[in-house]
Amino acid sequence: MLRWADFDDIQWEEVVMSLTKLIKELLRKPESIPAPGAIIYGATVTRVLRKPEVKIASDIVEKVKNGTILDLGSGPGFLSTEIARKSPGLQVCGIDLSRQMPRIARRRARGVGNVQFVFGNAARLPFKGNSIDLAVSTGVFHHVKSPRLVFEECYRVLKAGGEAWIYDGYPEVFRSPADRKKLGQQYGFLVGRLGSTVSAIHGFTGEEYETDIRGALEQTAFKGHYEMASSDIWMKITLRKLP
């Protein structure tokens, strides 16, 4: 029988990497989270992401004063509701492929009149072209089977001059103890302790961003009009639809 002591650090790292890869592949098979998982997700992962999403909401309302914001994969609705509360002049719509998530989100947003939540697929958005001022997505693209299709839909629905801000996990930002300590101080204990694990499962490696995500973007109308850079706990991809 194998014991923990039989594995050296390198072997443990290989085991962890293999398990992480397996979990990520399992997560990508269902693009939506079924009902029991939706409730658990709303109570756990969103707790880790709460403070980082507050910052994103602040950045959005600073960028867009009036107009329509689309939250792709809005989940339990924290980010959408936070944006709507911060800026009553905005109309916010969250869309999610899980039927349970919009129900959870509507309960969270009760009393907030400028936000709505709908069931739908980010690869086939139920919105007219040139109708969205800014699209945002946090921690969703690692679930997406075809990022290119979602990027193309973002381009279609964005108004000329509009942007899409895509955030997803990037475990490299938690690589050193100093990085984990700094982010923990900035965003709370849970981010410092669990951020690396959450990002490894709910995100992409640097290599995957360069091959899978950049490769998909280069096949869309966003080619030459996007930026990809680490931002706090995330990798942030900024997409621009030129005027």
Label each PLM-derived region with a short phrase.
Residues 237-243:
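C-terminal lobe and adjacent flexible extensions of AdoMet/dcAdoMet transferase-like proteins
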